[in-house]
């Protein structure tokens, strides 16, 4: 992300996302009420009931920020607070897409915190990885990035029975097709890593073909009990895969969640969850790592949103680690039952000491 602070009070910043990961970073950083100046286009009347698409620069006070993973676009909407007078757009609603490479200027009345600016400036695309799970019944392929996982394919093998004379030939075709799809998606998403999972030797045959077709790709195999989407999710829980993909925050999040569950089974005093409780321990300087879903940052509940904002500022200012993940990611869905946010503590904090 390109970041330029344009005023001494750190109210105005100029930004340019340089990857899809940057777009997601914008999604979790922009807030309703921020004013965005951006070059966009809008239909305007030109007489005789006709309209024409005109390029213009608008200042928009945001009330909606939407990100759809793997589309390369972030959609922002709000009320126009400044625009060309001749088109009468002030006070009207406008929506536009922020794409990779788009420059935008963001104004925030209360200013930007040091932690927010640092997060934007240091945020780099962690890259992507493709993950496949294959057996004699199913083949699934997914792409994994810091902002989420997308299933690209989930198909049945439909192989003939073991006694069918054509089975060996059909298995070979199945392996060829699986390898081809992995190579195609690795190239399309510029993924340096491919993980191929499944039971038995079939995954090894696929991996060998992938490696021959794309020598620059780092290919790893991992044993799982099945193929298909269930096999992909099983692979993500393997420690060997976590090591390979440790740069991706969604996998890092799985590790934090597993550590949280391990700790809570032994001692409730070593972890915290829910926005209010996490804020209480953050004020004590007790938080080592906090994991939360992105939707909390834009919660319609003012108390929840303010508690989360303060907790994150405190944790980051005291050298703690903050991991923000999509609510619809595997780890994000599991976080819902804990109020959307959990924390690993540096030292035990008794329950009675956590009251705000």
Swiss-Prot record:
InterPro entries cross-referenced by the UniProt entry: eFR1_2_sf, eRF1_1_Pelota, eRF1_3, Pelota/DOM34_N, Pelota_arc, Ribosomal_eL30-like_sf, Transl-rel_pelota
Annotated function: May function in recognizing stalled ribosomes, interact with stem-loop structures in stalled mRNA molecules, and effect endonucleolytic cleavage of the mRNA. May play a role in the release non-functional ribosomes and degradation of damaged mRNAs. Has endoribonuclease activity.
EC number, as in UniProt: 3.1.-.-
Assembly information from the UniProt record: Monomer.
Necessary cofactors: a divalent metal cation
MF annotations from Gene Ontology: endonuclease activity; metal ion binding
Leading EC class: hydrolase
Lineage: Archaea, Thermoproteota, Thermoprotei, Desulfurococcales, Desulfurococcaceae
Keyword match Transmembrane helix: no
Keywords: Cytoplasm, Endonuclease, Hydrolase, Metal-binding, Nuclease
Family of the protein in this entry: Belongs to the eukaryotic release factor 1 family. Pelota subfamily.
Main location: cytoplasm
Domain of life (superkingdom): Archaea
Protein name, entry field: Protein pelota homolog
Gene name per UniProt: pelA
Pfam families: eRF1_1 (PF03463), eRF1_3 (PF03465)
Compartments (UniProt record): Cytoplasm
Gene3D superfamilies listed in its UniProt record: 3.30.1330.30, eRF1 domain 2, Pelota, domain A
Domain remark in the UniProt entry: The N-terminal domain has the RNA-binding Sm fold. It harbors the endoribonuclease activity.
One Gene Ontology term from the biological process aspect of the record: nonfunctional rRNA decay
GO CC terms, sorted: cytoplasm
